[in-house]
């Protein structure tokens, strides 16, 4: 145990330098050579060379025959974890009042996928993001929801997308907060037809804590408060592939585990 801890501490020393960390993160974007790194990081070539040598000796980076440096498999793994730390540190104030809820370990371990995102604050602003995602959809809309809005603008967007053939899949919490306008919405002919044709599909989950709304290119995710309450007043919105892939994988996992939808389960 002591030996492994000592080895781990030694590995952390390799990235405990601002310059070495900057080199790693730059190489995580693209391979490059010594002179380019020197210009980018505004550091002498000799200092860059010294740190490149240390990172190479630590098996974090490698040099090819053309003189370009790139990350090793180990280096890529380290950078992936650095992104997780970065996401958490940049949003430390948010996470002082929020948790990861019931996220499985694989989603927590890949939380760095969300690092390139925008922190949206305010209930109205998060609702605007949802509507934006709905409007921008060209293929599908996927939701994991606790509070379900049936305001006229949202319903019109949904109906418009249904007419375009957009697939809509939603996981609702068994304890979902439902608007009194729900009955009118589900009785709408376009929506009833979409449900019948399975263009609009729904499932029920006993334990919804982390929420997502996404289309094929963008998404947003909302984490619960420290007391366990779902919070839709703040969200993280992103358009990168890594952000979207994380949201999609999480939705698919929840969709697979959720049960069949029955209208009588949805109480006002």
PLM feature segments, named:
Residues 65-73:
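Short, basic, alpha-helical segments at the C-terminal edge of helix-turn-helix-like DNA-binding modules
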Residues 59:
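Glycine-centered, phosphate/nucleic-acid-interacting loop/turn motifs that mediate DNA/RNA or nucleotide
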Residues 71, 143, 221-222:
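Short hydrophobic/aromatic-rich beta-strand segments that constitute the beta-sheet cores
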Residues 95-170:
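PLD-like (HKD) phosphodiesterase/transphosphatidyltransferase domain
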Residues 77-91:
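Alpha-helical "hinge/linker" immediately C-terminal to small N-terminal DNA-binding modules
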Residues 30-31, 68:
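Residue at a beta-strand N-cap/secondary-structure junction
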Residues 1-25, 36, 41, 46-47, ...:
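PLD/PLD-like phosphodiesterase catalytic module centered on the HKD motif
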